[in-house]
């Protein structure tokens, strides 16, 4: 078997491409490699057309643990349902590819990216996006490409192209920029409160690199002798479109200008007009051109009616500067926010509403053992902040089965999670595991940004000391020729009929998350820059409204939340606390009814619903790890009697032995003649032997006083009730 090997030198690295060797029955296939990361990306188109009004595109990303030299856990030792990470990468591939296929295409297309080997220095996701473009070009599928993606990081003042996982963690920015020859088509970013200007410069830096990869793909096609298939729109019978334009333009236009109408009223009136048109056409003679045309395609009337509505709405925005609800282009919908709306058995709760979009967010405080273990190719082994987003059918007035979260719900949850993560307190300050759930109760655009706002409010209500509150808004765009209008806080119909959905989240200081999706084939950086700048006053306005509901963390936690104490011990003494076979730590947890977690670095976290019990456990652990020195005097309690002496607890959990010869200046025949179990005595540390055993004495020690137990200084991370 022979294939063609080519390479691209990019940012000082070699990207290796192998074509014509793998997956010979796929429409197009490429093995794309950089470092030790290898992905096989395929693109296949069927000739079977779907009777749908959308492009039936499926993008899948598969990663098997053998790519990192690991065997899956679980009884079956086999990969199961794709992890969340795989779903997010599949979406990352889908989002820049979808707008580059012609809107009229109805052929089934499937792109599959399989990670066969993973190098931690070379993340697989952006390679998969670029590989999807190459595979599609090789399959000769009509496509407004080439398209490519790069990741940009920021360490200090320097932008880094395609940083490693470690560099991403160290830096203040993680942004993926995807683009076509016409401009940027997708952005996905997380940032540490980065300024708008720095963010714009990062996008510009990324698109310059994208342009290099686009040229490299064009050269690859020339080398392989493949001519790119440019989309050629098929001729359609315009009779129905002409009929609708003549008969429906005026009534639709009147509806779109009823600015005081609710969404429901507007939708009902538009549906009524569409139904009247359907009835008129159905009443025509069987040989009428319109009836023949619509009988062959039952969805044609709905599709063309939607196109006309879209055209009129866009024209109103471009020519009159007015939106369907009467707002100006830069106006935010009415906002209401409230915190603490549920009983305190829910640790934190909030309700955020913007227009008809309403989100209920809840926060649960968990212990370190509640962290999510990651069994995928992500170098991180656990997550301590989880955001789950739910979109039930009733939120849009529909009915459908409620099953497991779909790709959209996973993606929106990840976006909200990314927006909040930079402002979370450090684990030494607040070592709780946090789970936020955002329930979309009503949807009319920008529910993910509603989730960001609701999350901030519920976290503050739970008493989480955020570094700063976060708000978010969705920006839209209408582009007709050279005319461009940017919309602030888009609602559902503007998202559906517009050209861009650009979500911007951040604090007063700067941006924490971006997500931009397009329905056109690209936008210049200048337009993206304008949208980012216009989002700032909207974000700050929303933030002001949120702070009217709650502007700082609650001073006390819910009485039903666990209480945590966090402190540090010498890592070399972790074994002392755990004890042989875990007996010591098990004894402490059983005695105090607490949960104890110890990290390799020596950070101990004690969880309990009883603050006094947590303090008792801390005293025991600090007693076990406190270094005892010869000559120190301690008050103690006799815990055991043996023939040759008595054991005395001098610190919580730490015992020493008084040999029978050290019980008194005089000769002692029986230990019980001097002390009994439970007696309080004062002892001096006589010696610590080579095995670390503490030998004590009562000789020469006054028994009417002495040192008291040393009181450890607790470092509580939450108020103790």
UniProtKB/Swiss-Prot annotation:
Domain of life assignment: Bacteria
Statement: the UniProt record of this protein carries the keyword Magnesium: yes
One of the record's GO molecular function terms: RNA binding
One cellular component (GO) term of this entry: cytosol
Domain KH: 562-621
Catalytic activity: RNA(n+1) + phosphate = RNA(n) + a ribonucleoside 5'-diphosphate
A biological process from GO: RNA processing
Pfam families for this protein: KH_1, PNPase, RNase_PH, RNase_PH_C, S1
S1 motif domain boundaries: 631-699
Family matches, as Gene3D superfamilies: GHMP Kinase, N-terminal domain, K Homology domain, type 1, Nucleic acid-binding proteins
The protein's role, per its UniProt record: Involved in mRNA degradation. Catalyzes the phosphorolysis of single-stranded polyribonucleotides processively in the 3'- to 5'-direction.
Record family assignment: Belongs to the polyribonucleotide nucleotidyltransferase family.
Protein name: Polyribonucleotide nucleotidyltransferase
Species, as recorded: Prochlorococcus marinus subsp. pastoris (strain CCMP1986 / NIES-2087 / MED4)
Highest classification ranks of the organism: Bacteria, Bacillati, Cyanobacteriota, Cyanophyceae, Synechococcales
Originating gene: pnp
């Amino acid at each position: 078997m022979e294939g063609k090997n080519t390479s691209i030198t990019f940012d000082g690295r070699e990207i290796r491409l192998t074509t014509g060797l793998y997956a010979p029955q796929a429409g197009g296939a490429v093995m794309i490699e950089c470092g030790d990361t290898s992905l096989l990306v395929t693109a296949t188109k069927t000739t079977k057309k779907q009777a749908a009004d959308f492009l039936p595109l499926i993008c899948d990303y598969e990663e098997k643990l053998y790519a990192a030299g690991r065997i899956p856990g679980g009884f079956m030792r086999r990969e199961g349902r794709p992890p969340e990470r795989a779903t997010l990468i599949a979406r990352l591939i889908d989002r820049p590819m979808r707008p580059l296929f012609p809107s009229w295409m109805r052929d089934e297309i499937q792109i599959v990216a399989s990670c066969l080997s993973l190098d931690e220095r070379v993340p697989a996701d952006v390679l998969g996006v670029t590989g999807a473009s190459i595979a599609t070009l090789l399959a000769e599928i009509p496509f407004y490409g080439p398209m490519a993606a790069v990741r940009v990081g920021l360490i200090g003042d320097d932008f880094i192209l395609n940083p490693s996982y470690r560099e991403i963690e160290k830096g203040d920015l993680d942004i993926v920029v995807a683009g076509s020859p016409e401009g940027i088509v997708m952005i996905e970013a997380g940032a540490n409160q980065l300024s708008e200007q720095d963010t714009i410069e990062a996008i510009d830096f990324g698109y310059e690199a994208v342009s290099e990869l686009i040229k490299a793909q064009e050269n690859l096609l020339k080398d392989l002798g493949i001519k790119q298939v440019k989309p050629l729109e098929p001729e359609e019978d315009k009779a129905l479109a002409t009929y609708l334009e003549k008969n429906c333009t005026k009534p639709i236009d009147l509806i779109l200008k009823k600015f005081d109408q609710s969404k429901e009223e507007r939708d009902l009136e538009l549906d009524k007009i569409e139904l009247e048109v359907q009835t008129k056409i159905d009443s025509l003679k069987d040989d009428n051109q319109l009836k023949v045309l619509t009988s062959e395609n039952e969805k044609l009337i709905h599709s063309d009616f939607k196109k006309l509505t879209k055209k009129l709405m866009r024209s109103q925005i471009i020519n009159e500067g007015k939106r369907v609800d009467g707002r100006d282009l830069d106006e935010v919908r009415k906002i209401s926010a409230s915190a603490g709306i549920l009983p305190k058995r829910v640790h934190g709760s909030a309700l955020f509403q913007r227009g008809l979009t309403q989100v209920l967010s809840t926060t649960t405080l968990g212990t370190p053992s509640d962290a999510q273990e990651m069994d995928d190719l992500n170098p991180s082994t656990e997550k301590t902040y989880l955001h789950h987003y739910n979109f039930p059918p009733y939120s849009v007035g529909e009915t459908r089965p409620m099953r497991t979260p779909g790709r959209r719900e996973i993606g929106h949850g990840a976006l909200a999670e990314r927006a909040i993560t930079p402002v979370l307190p450090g684990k030494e300050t607040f070592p709780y595991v946090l789970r936020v759930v955002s329930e979309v109760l009503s949807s009319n655009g920008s529910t993910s940004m509603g989730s960001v706002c609701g999350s901030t409010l519920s976290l503050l209500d739970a008493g989480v000391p955020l570094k700063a509150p976060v708000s978010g808004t969705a920006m839209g765009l209408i582009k007709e020729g050279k005319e461009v209008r940017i919309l602030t806080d888009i609602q559902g119909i503007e998202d559906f009929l517009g050209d861009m959905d650009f979500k911007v989240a951040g604090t007063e200081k700067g941006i924490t998350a971006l997500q931009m999706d397009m329905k056109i084939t690209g936008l210049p950086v200048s337009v993206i820059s304008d949208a980012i700048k216009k989002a700032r006053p909207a974000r700050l306005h929303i933030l002001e409204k949120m702070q009217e509901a709650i502007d700082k963390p609650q001073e006390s936690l819910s009485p039903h939340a666990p209480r945590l104490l966090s402190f540090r011990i010498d890592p070399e003494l972790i074994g002392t606390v755990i004890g042989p076979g875990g007996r010591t730590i098990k004894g402490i947890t059983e005695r105090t009814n607490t949960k104890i977690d110890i990290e390799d670095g020596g950070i101990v976290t004690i969880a309990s619903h009883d603050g006094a019990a947590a303090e008792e456990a801390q005293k025991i652990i600090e007693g076990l790890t406190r270094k005892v020195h010869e000559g120190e005097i301690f008050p103690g309690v006799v815990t055991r009697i043996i023939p040759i002496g008595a054991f005395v607890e001098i610190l919580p959990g730490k015992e020493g032995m008084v040999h029978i010869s050290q019980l008194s200046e005089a000769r002692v025949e029986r230990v019980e003649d001097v002390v009994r179990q439970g007696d309080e005595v004062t002892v001096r540390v006589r010696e610590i032997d080579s095995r670390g055993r503490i030998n004590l004495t009562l000789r020469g020690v006054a028994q009417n006083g002495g040192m008291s137990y040393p009181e450890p200084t607790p470092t509580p991370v939450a108020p103790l009730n």
